[in-house]
Amino acid sequence: MTFPRALTVIDDNGLVISIIFWFLLIIILILFSIALLNIIKLCMVCCNLGRTVIVPVQHAYDAYKNFMRIKAYNHDGALLV
């Protein structure tokens, strides 16, 4: 089924409508992401998420960094054979 030629403004096979729908989808995803970030911030403020989750994770990461630290090469302490 084709539309009458009188109703066709631009014969682009739906490209313009497809682009408009993609932009709407991108805008909706961006707004959803912003809302999700604001909900996470609200949980951090109201539920003390920062103290119960983030601080222990930071301590564990600091312990991992200290464990994985490699001492620098010392020229004077090198043993030449």
Swiss-Prot record:
> Per the record, what ranges lie on the membrane's Virion surface side?
1-19
The protein's location, in the record's own words, is: Host Golgi apparatus membrane
Keywords for the protein's UniProt record, in alphabetical order: Apoptosis, Host Golgi apparatus, Host membrane, Membrane, Transmembrane, Transmembrane helix
Q: How does it sit in the membrane?
A: Single-pass type III membrane protein
Matching entries from InterPro entries are given as: E_protein_aCoV (IPR043507), E_protein_CoV (IPR003873)
Q: Membrane-spanning residues where?
A: 20-40
Q: What is its main location?
A: host cell
Keyword Cell cycle set for record: no
Q: Name one Pfam family in it.
A: CoV_E
Chain ranges sitting on the Intravirion side read 41-81
Q: Could you give one GO CC term from the UniProt record?
A: membrane
GO process annotations (BP) = disruption of cellular anatomical structure in another organism; viral budding from Golgi membrane
Q: What does this protein do?
A: Plays a central role in virus morphogenesis and assembly. Acts as a viroporin and self-assembles in host membranes forming pentameric protein-lipid pores that allow ion transport. Also plays a role in the induction of apoptosis.
* Oligomer and partners: Homopentamer. Interacts with membrane protein M in the budding compartment of the host cell, which is located between endoplasmic reticulum and the Golgi complex. Interacts with Nucleoprotein.
The record's family statement is:
Belongs to the alphacoronaviruses E protein family.
What this protein is called in its record is Envelope small membrane protein
The species this protein was found in? Porcine transmissible gastroenteritis coronavirus (strain FS772/70)
